Swiss-Prot record:
Described function: Specifically methylates the N7 position of a guanine in 16S rRNA.
Organism: Parasynechococcus marenigrum (strain WH8102)
Family from the record: Belongs to the methyltransferase superfamily. RNA methyltransferase RsmG family.
Main location (coarse class): cytoplasm
Location(s), subcellular: Cytoplasm
Residues that bind S-adenosyl-L-methionine: 85, 90, 137-138, 156
Single annotated GO MF: rRNA (guanine-N7-)-methyltransferase activity
Keywords: Cytoplasm, Methyltransferase, rRNA processing, S-adenosyl-L-methionine, Transferase
Protein name: Ribosomal RNA small subunit methyltransferase G
Presence of keyword Nucleotide-binding: no
The EC number(s) this enzyme carries: 2.1.1.-
Length: 248
């Protein structure tokens, strides 16, 4: 993708062209309102430092949405999606705004963050199709209401790829996709991930990369798909996936 410097205020047409998706006026208003809400909540809860200018529009909005260019071609299609480790609400809130057909679950283990995100969901008028849950993913992955129920499961800046795979794969429908948002990515990362996918009964379906606008760095997206049902023992008990990563 070509690089497009950001203006001081709202993004221009070149920004959205680079993203491959242009918001409706109401969606742009929601994205701006989300920025204002983040500013307000950051004074009470440390959600994110990426709130102003390029930090928000590129490192939050653009970085949340570019991996979903395929899905953004049919934004009103009914989908069930989950954002694991949502933190301050990304990528989940940006995805919910951009894809009106999606029903989103935003999951995080830190109660003060989920309380802030729930308040933002309410203020943005998204509570009819966005739910916020406070839980550890190792526990949530065994919940009958979540396990095997999602078309899309995504995680950004959560843990190493083999760990994230163990978190996300059990949540997928048989034809679902896990989206691993990655920064640096190389051959060693790929080998470790492929080894981790074997016991999960999953496979790597695609990988792609993107140069963020304004020379904000390169990002990678790794998509995973189930091959057969994920064994019931995954995800393992709280803390085990990160201490003893699959494929290590």
């Amino acid at each position: 993708m070509q690089q497009h410097p950001m203006p001081d205020s709202l993004p221009g047409a070149a920004f959205w062209e680079a993203l491959g998706w242009t918001p409706e006026p109401a969606q742009l208003g929601q994205l701006k309102a989300l920025q204002d809400l983040l500013r307000s909540w950051n004074s009470r809860v440390n959600l994110t430092r990426l709130v102003e200018g390029d930090d928000y529009w590129i490192n939050q909005v653009f970085d949340s949405l570019w991996p979903l260019q395929t899905e953004l071609r049919s934004p009103h299609q009914s989908r069930l999606a989950i954002d694991v480790g949502t933190g301050g609400g990304f990528p989940g809130l940006a995805v919910a705004i951009a894809m009106p057909g999606a029903r989103m679950t935003l999951l995080d283990s830190v109660g003060r963050k989920t309380a802030a995100v729930q308040a933002m969901v309410n203020d943005l008028g998204l509570s009819d199709r966005v739910s916020v849950r406070t839980d550890r993913i190792e526990s949530a992955g065994h919940d009958r209401t979540l396990r095997g129920g999602f078309d899309l499961a995504m995680a950004r800046a959560v843990a190493a790829a083999p760990v994230v795979a163990e978190y996300l794969v059990p949540l997928l429908k048989p034809d679902g996709n896990a989206l691993l948002y990655r920064g640096q990515w190389g051959d060693t990362d790929l080998r470790q991930l492929k080894r981790a996918l074997v016991p999960l009964n999953a496979q790597l379906s695609s990988s792609q990369h993107c140069q963020l606008p304004a020379e904000r760095g390169v990002r990678h997206l790794i998509r995973l798909q189930p091959v057969s049902p994920c064994p019931r023992q995954f995800p393992r008990a709280v803390g085990v996936p990160s201490r003893q990563p699959l494929g290590g």
